[in-house]
Amino acid sequence: DPRICKNAVRREEISYGDMLLLAQKGAQVLHDRSVALAQAGGVPITVRSCREGGAGSIVCKTDEDASVVGVTQKKSGRSRLAAITAVGGALPSIEKEKIAVTALERAEITVFAVAAGERFMSFYVVRDDAERALQLVHDALIAAKE
């Protein structure tokens, strides 16, 4: 979300699988069921900003990217923690985990836990630090590569 992450990187295309993971992990771009239905029907989705216009991104059947393609946050109910999740083919990775955790610790943000699965890693931080943590993880794992 460019409103939260000032140097967000626009992707021309993103795979259904990566967008589905981002939606499930908190991205408020598309609902996860809409992505699953589009994938089942082979229907590409064009996502654009309603404020800025522009080319946007296409969610479609494409080779899944081998890099980190997105970072999102999820604040659940009454929990005092928020999950900052990075998604992409480069994950999970001990190297990427160290890079992200180091960036967060340098900013004096405590990482309470790290969870990983196929194509994602989540970093659990205090809810009040979520937006700053999202920016830091984005900068460490995506912007540094651009």
Placement of each model-derived feature along the sequence:
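C-terminal catalytic "cap/lid" subdomain
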Residues: 1-146
